[in-house]
Amino acid sequence: MATVNQLVRKPRAPKVDKTNVPALEACPQKRGVCTRVYTTAPKKPNSALRKVARVRLTNGFEVTSYIGGEGHNLQEHSVILIRGGRVKDLPGVRYHTIRGALDCAGVNARRQARSKYGAKRPKS
């Protein structure tokens, strides 16, 4: 236990909490421009061609964002919205692209979990 005199000289340091999504700067989403759209292979034991985009954000950060869902219309210079959320089998991918916002179209013919993929309600 520190004495009063010790605390007067050197106060207690507040705990610093580390964020998993530093590029968002405590915002729920950020806008950015795709600088490169490509596919990458996941870590073992998984096998696929995961779609990702390198994005230059409005705050100057350059991050890698995962593009979820089947098919996408993104290319270089597309303006997209990203949110936090890592992809466990892709090292260095800590952000997700929000489907159905800005230049990123929603997933076609999506029936379930539509809100997560920007898909409109199908005509019954």
UniProtKB/Swiss-Prot annotation:
GO annotation, cellular component aspect: small ribosomal subunit
InterPro entries assigned to the protein according to its UniProt record, in alphabetical order: NA-bd_OB-fold, Ribosomal_uS12, Ribosomal_uS12_bac
Positions bearing 3-methylthioaspartic acid: D89
Keyword terms, alphabetized: Methylation, Ribonucleoprotein, Ribosomal protein, RNA-binding, rRNA-binding, tRNA-binding
UniProt-listed HAMAP family: Ribosomal_uS12_B
Subunit relationships: Part of the 30S ribosomal subunit. Contacts proteins S8 and S17. May interact with IF1 in the 30S initiation complex.
Family: Belongs to the universal ribosomal protein uS12 family.
Family annotation (NCBIfam families): rpsL_bact
Protein name: Small ribosomal subunit protein uS12
Organism: Shewanella amazonensis (strain ATCC BAA-1098 / SB2B)
Lineage, top ranks: Bacteria, Pseudomonadati, Pseudomonadota, Gammaproteobacteria, Alteromonadales
